[in-house]
């Protein structure tokens, strides 16, 4: 929807210009001002719609990006302080790179260069999701992943933690480094140990 909003603002721009304008617009966007593709419709069908004037919970949203069709909802209701900070930093970086690209100082390849997540921080938390079968593992990992945002909220409430940045990638752990409470000698090929890495920086 952010791309669509950019296209609305620059309807005749080329693809390259749209990419640059995307980063320009949203590097300067003053959140929590909402991104709207169209004005909300006054349709009285008794569905709950995003409206911070009425719903106190909507007022707490940090990065509201509102779906255009009725009933309008905030598509980014799960964004917290840390994820907002991470996205803002990435968008600012994208704007800096596209500025250089548009000025002919670098190529588009630079915009897609991968970053080393583990070089950004000094402190890490590793979540290990372990179960006995592949079927159980799939369900268990899904449950663990669904609860990570609650862990982030807890970390953000710690005054000594400035940022909690989730790494969405999963890793197979080194068996010798697993905690002793996990059965390292299980040779069942259906057992999948996945580590979900988080990182936090102290203020």
Q: Over which residues does each language-model region extend?
A:
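Non-catalytic helical "accessory" subdomain of NTase-fold nucleotidyltransferases
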Residues: 1-203
């Amino acid at each position: 929807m952010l791309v669509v909003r950019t296209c609305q603002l620059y309807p005749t721009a080329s693809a390259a210009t749209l990419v640059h304008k995307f980063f320009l617009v949203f590097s300067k966007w003053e959140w929590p001002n909402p991104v709207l593709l169209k004005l909300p419709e006054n349709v009285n069908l008794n569905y709950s719609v995003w409206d911070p004037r009425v719903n106190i919970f909507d007022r707490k949203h940090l990065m509201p990006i509102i779906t255009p069709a009725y009933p309008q909802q905030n598509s980014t209701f799960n964004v917290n302080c840390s994820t907002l900070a991470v996205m803002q930093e990435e968008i600012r970086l994208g704007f800096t790179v596209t500025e250089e690209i548009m000025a002919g100082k670098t190529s588009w390849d630079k915009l897609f260069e991968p970053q080393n997540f583990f070089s950004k921080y000094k402190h890490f938390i590793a979540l290990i999701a372990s179960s006995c079968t592949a079927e159980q593992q799939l369900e268990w990992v899904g449950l663990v992943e669904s609860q990570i945002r609650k862990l982030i909220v807890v970390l953000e409430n710690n005054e000594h933690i400035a940022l909690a940045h989730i790494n969405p990638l999963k890793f197979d752990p080194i068996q010798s480094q697993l905690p002793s409470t996990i059965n390292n000698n299980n040779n069942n090929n259906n057992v999948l140990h996945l580590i979900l890495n988080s990182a936090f920086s102290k203020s």
